[in-house]
Amino acid sequence: MEKLTILVLVATVLLAIQVLVQSDGEKPLKRRVKQYAAKRLSALMRGPRQCTPRNQRCEGDAECCPNLVCKCFTRPDCQSGYKCDTS
């Protein structure tokens, strides 16, 4: 009887450990979902992003409208500047 009691206790402890490990694995996923929701809400509150249209001056790809990149429009030194253009 004593061996059976010890076996039941060990099984209970192992089951409890398994439940704790599985529940910890879900926390990062929940955190990522909340972070995404917060970023999405923030973007919606800011409104549409203003972008630089084609053939307008730019300083980096991030400011150009979708499907455009910031390119040097004078070769070879690029001292005159950059413009948004197709890739």
Swiss-Prot record:
Question: What keywords sit in the KW lines?
Answer: Disulfide bond, Pyrrolidone carboxylic acid, Secreted, Signal, Toxin
One GO MF annotation is: toxin activity
- Residues bearing PTM Pyrrolidone carboxylic acid: Q50
Cell compartments where the protein resides:
Secreted
Which residues are removed as the propeptide when the protein matures? Answer: 24-49
Q: Domain of life here?
A: Eukaryota
Pfam families (UniProt xref): Conotoxin (PF02950)
- PTM statement from Swiss-Prot or TrEMBL: Contains 4 disulfide bonds.
- Return the similarity comment: Belongs to the conotoxin O2 superfamily.
Its name, as the record gives it, is Conotoxin Bt15a
Q: Please report the organism this UniProt entry assigns to the protein.
A: Conus betulinus
Tell me the classification of the organism that encodes this protein: Eukaryota, Metazoa, Spiralia, Lophotrochozoa, Mollusca
